[in-house]
């Protein structure tokens, strides 16, 4: 079975998501058993299907954390993570506007990086990521549906040497299993809805996804106040977050709640 090379410190590999072998069938079975097994009450509702899928990644693969982000009308939305630390890692990527998840989705490639490469390739994100999380390696895989990239799966490792233990085939097989699970769940939702309606995927109603929508609301507030386009409003939010050592999602939440004044952010 092909495996990700042991990158060591400073190693980075970009791999086309096509290397799948028959040996991965066992991984597929284990993954299905992990996410379809008895869920704890906190993740039993349909909205938290991506959380169950992310936790199953950690059970089946030699990784420390996992996070799943999907695209919604050109916006990247976090829909599920294995734990709070994996959630924070995704939020750091979004705050800095760079990182492996973004590159995997943009380049339609599997991204593999150890600590030194994380710092080199994404300096702003890398500095915060290595400072505020225990992770020292990351593998990001594009999530594809009907030939289109619809998001990315981040796999985080506390020991960068474990990058050499993670099979490309296993990672891609798990990603395909995630895509299938989400597609089936959404099809079931659609079948229960009037034919003229296009229901929103239930996982976009999760708390992590709803929290991200506050960023778009905050952007709208800045666009109106400053008379700037959306990209500039997002840049202002990122600059304020960086200058105050804060996560962009938290800054947006404070703006929407009114505990932070727009004038303070635009200075």
Predicted features, each with a name:
Residues 1-95, 236, 253-267:
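Intrinsically disordered, low-complexity terminal regulatory regions
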Residues 187-267:
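Signal-transducing coiled-coil/dimerization helices and immediately adjacent hinge/linker segments
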Residues 168-180:
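Allosteric cytosolic regulatory segments
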Residues 152-162, 166, 182-184:
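Short beta-strand-to-loop transition segments that serve as allosteric relay/switch motifs
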Residues 136-144:
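A short, aliphatic-rich beta-strand micro-motif
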Residues 27-47, 110, 201-208, 217-223:
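Short regulatory/linker helices and ligand/cofactor-binding micro-motifs at input modules
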Residues 143-153, 178:
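Short hydrophobic/glycine-rich mini-motifs in sensory/regulatory modules
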Residues 67-71, 77-79, 86-123, 127-136:
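Regulatory sensory and allosteric helical modules in signal-transduction proteins
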């Amino acid at each position: 079975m092909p495996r990700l090379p042991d990158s060591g410190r400073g190693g980075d590999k970009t791999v086309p998501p096509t290397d799948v072998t028959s040996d991965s069938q066992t991984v597929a079975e284990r993954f299905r058993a992990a996410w379809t097994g008895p869920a704890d009450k906190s993740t039993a509702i349909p909205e938290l299907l991506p959380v169950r899928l992310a936790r199953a990644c950690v059970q089946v693969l030699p990784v420390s954390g996992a996070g799943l982000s999907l695209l919604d009308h050109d916006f990247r939305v976090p829909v599920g993570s294995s734990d709070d630390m994996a959630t924070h890692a995704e939020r750091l990527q979004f705050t800095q506007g760079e990182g492996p998840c973004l590159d995997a989705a943009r380049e339609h490639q599997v991204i593999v990086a150890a600590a030194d490469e994380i710092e080199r390739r994404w300096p702003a994100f890398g500095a915060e990521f290595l400072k505020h999380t225990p992770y020292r390696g990351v593998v990001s895989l594009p999530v594809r549906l009907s030939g289109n990239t619809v998001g990315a799966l981040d796999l985080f490792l506390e020991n960068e040497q474990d990058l050499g233990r993670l099979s490309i085939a296993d990672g891609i097989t798990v990603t395909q299993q995630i895509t299938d699970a989400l597609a089936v769940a959404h099809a079931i939702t659609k079948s229960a809805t009037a034919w003229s309606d296009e229901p929103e995927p239930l996982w976009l109603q999760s708390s992590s996804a709803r929290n991200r929508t506050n960023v778009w609301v905050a952007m709208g507030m800045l666009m109106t106040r400053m008379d700037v386009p959306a990209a500039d409003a997002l840049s202002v939010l990122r600059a304020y977050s960086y200058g105050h050592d804060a996560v962009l999602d938290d800054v947006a939440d404070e703006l929407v709640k009114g505990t932070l004044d727009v004038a303070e952010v635009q200075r």
